[in-house]
């Protein structure tokens, strides 16, 4: 799956999104697909997606929210949705990065979904802090760099099996169009 011509994420795999703008990054990636987006968030989480902010990225009617009551059900929901292969994007907000075995199960479920379902699903794990989910296909970090009259983000690919670390400046012009320009890695955020 490619977004904005340069952001490439292999389908039928699980990817980790981190940083203060990880929700916006998930919505940006969802905008590059068609069909429903399943967003899994813990029932005890204090915040929910705001429809007006969702509308900046995708049609809010595409969004389906699941709110499991138990922590172990978050990954179960994600795994089953990926295995079904009927939802192109499955997002899970997790309280902590999952270990290797559950991530491997997500990859296998997504591969099964791609072979049996109607689409090759994209699994997005949203982690707080710098993340650290073991075994993810890629790890991305996005943080806002807004200023007076400027809507911009710093986006990094921090880990990928088949690509080196890289950074971009993502910006939105006054007409709402997004542009992606190469950026230098900032030393204080590089790594992980």
Where are each of the predicted segments found?
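N-terminal regions of ATP-driven nucleic-acid and macromolecular assemblies
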Residues: 1-192
């Amino acid at each position: 799956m490619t977004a904005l011509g340069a952001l490439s994420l292999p389908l039928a795999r699980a990817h980790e999104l981190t940083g203060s703008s990880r929700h916006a990054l998930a919505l940006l990636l969802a905008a590059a697909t068609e069909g429903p987006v399943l967003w899994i968030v813990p029932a005890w989480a204090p915040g929910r997606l705001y429809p007006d902010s969702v509308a900046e990225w995708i049609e809010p009617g595409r969004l389906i929210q699941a709110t499991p009551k138990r922590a172990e059900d978050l990954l179960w929901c994600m795994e089953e949705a990926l295995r079904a292969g009927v939802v192109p994007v499955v997002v899970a907000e997790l309280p902590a990065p999952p270990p290797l075995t559950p991530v491997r199960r997500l990859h296998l479920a997504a591969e099964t979904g791609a072979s049996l379902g109607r689409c090759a699903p994209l699994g997005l794990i949203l982690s707080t802090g710098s993340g650290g989910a073991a075994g993810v296909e890629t790890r991305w970090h996005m943080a806002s760099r807004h200023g007076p009259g400027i809507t911009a983000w710093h986006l990094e690919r921090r880990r990928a099996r088949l690509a080196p670390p890289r950074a971009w400046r993502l910006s939105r012009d006054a007409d709402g169009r997004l542009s992606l320009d190469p950026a230098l890695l900032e030393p204080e955020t590089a790594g992980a």
